[in-house]
Amino acid sequence: MVQQAESSEAESNLPRDALDTEEGEFMACSPVALDESDPDWCKTASGHIKRPMNAFMVWSKIERRKIMEQSPDMHNAEISKRLGKRWKMLKDSEKIPFIREAERLRLKHMADYPDYKYRPRKKPKTDPAAKPSAGQSPDKSAAGAKAAKGPGKKCAKLKAPAGKAGAGKAAQPGDCAAGKAAKCVFLDDDDEDDDEDDELQLRPKPDADDDDDEPAHSHLLPPPTQQQPPQLLRRYSVAKVPASPTLSSAAESPEGASLYDEVRAGGRLYYSFKNITKQQPPPAPPALSPASSRCVSTSSSSGSSSGSGAEDADDLMFDLSLNFSQGAHSACEQPLGAGAAGNLSLSLVDKDLDSFSEGSLGSHFEFPDYCTPELSEMIAGDWLEANFSDLVFTY
């Protein structure tokens, strides 16, 4: 009541002409002024207490009546749209009487309904089980929701260490810090005492995890005494070519023989130099290198044994990468003294193989020169005709 008196004094301090013009019309048209004598002026038929109107609601109620009188067929949504635009266009000075009336209604509402508390309707949730009943108070519904979330938090807390333990077998010991960060424990005040023992049991132990991870990896690898000897690891390195250029030294070299035996003893099938030279042709002159003794090289030129040792060694390694295809084996079975036609065809094959081996060592875009004499002659010829009239087409 004291606040109402203060508001009335504030109204009396305003200019009298302002009260006579807008506020007089406002009080005359105000629907609330007629019903304020009723003690249930803000209650609905079902007993629900309505909220006090704000300034826009007070103004829109008056203006809505005017619009409905002028155009009764206008839709309610269209009226609301127009009223919203007009309210935004109003000046602050024009809104003052409606703001004052809304404040007066708010104070009267507080005096008539002191126990009123604004409780907006909660939107229905998608999960019907989590939806509280309509008659339940907000405090009880909040407590029920809190109790419903409790088991879910415990389950999440139990799942996190289980998932970490399953992933610990594949993870390295250095990943233990990441596993710790993945564990999130949310505890309510009433669950802290109950969950202390569980948390102590589920808390990750860095030392134990490191010790557990090592045996998990140890069954995959043999112990240090059972690991592969260093000589068996040499099978992954490139096989050495004997340094001596003679055939006799290649067969008599103890180092080369021991290397090839270790390769065959490794338990996997590897082509050794003994398999290469198994089908040797009749003894060649001593000036031939070991790579020259292979059949493709011997057939490349009939009787000519010239060629550097480095190029022959590269050809030998290329033959290893080809895995001795059937064509190479058929070429090996030909005698050294074959006809000129056979030597010519094998020499062409040898040139193609050498060009492929050289191209594989470089870039994919380095193409060898395959120009034949006829092609080079065509390229070198005159491209422009001497007589320009020959280039003119006649139809």
From Swiss-Prot:
SMART domains: HMG. Disruption phenotype: Mice die at birth with numerous morphological abnormalities. Incomplete separation of the heart ventricles with fused aorta and pulmonary arteries. Skeletal malformations including hypoplastic sternebrae, unfused vertebral bodies and hypomineralized skull. All mice have microphthalmia and open eyelids, with 50% of mice exhibiting omphalocele, and 40% exhibiting cleft palate, cleft lips and a tail kink. Sox11 and Sox4 double knockout mice die in utero at 10.5 dpc. Keywords: Activator, Developmental protein, Differentiation, DNA-binding, Neurogenesis, Nucleus, Transcription, Transcription regulation. GO terms for cellular component: nucleoplasm; nucleus; plasma membrane. GO terms for biological process: closure of optic fissure; cornea development in camera-type eye; embryonic digestive tract morphogenesis; embryonic skeletal system morphogenesis; eyelid development in camera-type eye; glial cell development; glial cell proliferation; hard palate development. CDD domains: HMG-box_SoxC_SOX11 (cd22037). Residues 363-395 are annotated as: Required for transcriptional activation activity and synergistic coactivation of transcriptional activity with POU3F2. Residues 187-199 have a biased composition (Acidic residues). The keyword DNA-binding applies. The keyword Nucleotide-binding does not apply. InterPro entries: HMG_box_dom, HMG_box_dom_sf, SOX-12/11/4, SRY-related_HMG-box_TF-like. Residues 1-22, 114-258, 276-312 are annotated as: Disordered. GO terms for molecular function: cis-regulatory region sequence-specific DNA binding; DNA binding; DNA-binding transcription activator activity, RNA polymerase II-specific; DNA-binding transcription factor activity; DNA-binding transcription factor activity, RNA polymerase II-specific; RNA polymerase II cis-regulatory region sequence-specific DNA binding; transcription cis-regulatory region binding. It holds the Pfam family HMG_box. Residues 1-11 have a biased composition (Polar residues). It is found in: Nucleus. Residues 158-174, 289-309 have a biased composition (Low complexity). Residues 49-117 bind DNA. This is Transcription factor SOX-11. It comes from Mus musculus.
